[in-house]
Amino acid sequence: MIIDAHMHLPSGEPDLDSKKRRLLSDMRANGVDIGIVISDSELESTIGSMDDCTELFSDCPNVFAAAGISPYINYRKQLEKLKKYLTLGFFVGIKLYCGHEPIYIDDGDLKPVFRLAAEFDVPVLFHSGWDNAQCAAPERAKAAAAANPEARLVCCHCYYPKLAKCFETLKSCPNVYFDLSSVADDPEKCPSVAQVLERYIPEMPERFIFGSDYGCCDQRRHIDFIKKLDIPSDYLQDVIHGNAARIYNISS
Ligand SMILES: [Zn+2]
């Protein structure tokens, strides 16, 4: 069983329906049983908006969606819409594109997002690492985790490429989880990334989640990378499906 907890609609297809078909066929080809597709925070996007992603995957029992949102884009209205969708059980997470947009993860403007996440028991995902890395630097993520103890925070990309700094700073925050998407993107960095993961996964095996960033990164390469890690097989099972199922409340 593999859950890829970090996917986007792929580029290179003419419309949303063909993107969906490609994504589903790639999941099958790569042996991925369950996927979480993350929408953009934009109202129109090549990776799909909140509306697009709910509509597209409502008939796919093995594909769940997480909703992108931004304090800069129609915030109040999008929050209302998000609440409506969460009430209907349409999203399993909420994503903040810290760094891609000038959003600081510990900014007070994000309070309504954390409140919704707590109310509907879904995690808040945030981009971290390359691309204005200061927006979700580990110290800021730590502050956000402490300010929102009732929320689960998912740190996407683990502050890539500074993974060790991320784990060291955030290991004391029990409500922060680590999404491994895109960490195997650069084959040259894979050996050093593997070394860091082989050290930290056994320290907190319940807090790592497999993801590939499908749509931006190679899913097959990420699966091969994670399966080759030198960690106990129980921990590998946690990382490739058990933890995601629990953290996102999805059955596997
Ligand atoms: Zn992504």
For each predicted feature, which ranges?
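Active-site gating/metal-coordination segments in enzymes
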Residues: 34, 48-125, 130-131, 174-176, ...
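Catalytic pocket-lining loop regions of alpha/beta-barrel enzymes
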Residues: 92-93, 107-209
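Histidine-centered catalytic micro-motifs
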Residues: 2-10, 125-129
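Mid-to-C-terminal alpha-helical segments outside catalytic/metal-binding sites
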Residues: 1-5, 17-34, 118, 204-207, ...
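Alpha-helical scaffolding within the catalytic cores
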Residues: 18-23, 47-55, 78-81, 138-140, ...
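Active-site environment of divalent metal-dependent phosphoester hydrolases
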Residues: 10-13, 42-45, 72-74, 101, ...
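Active-site neighborhood of phospho(di)ester-bond hydrolases with catalytic His/Asp-centered motifs
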Residues: 2-5, 36-39, 66-68, 95, ...
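Divalent metal-dependent hydrolysis catalytic cores, especially in the metallo-beta-lactamase
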Residues: 8, 22-44, 62-70, 92-93, ...
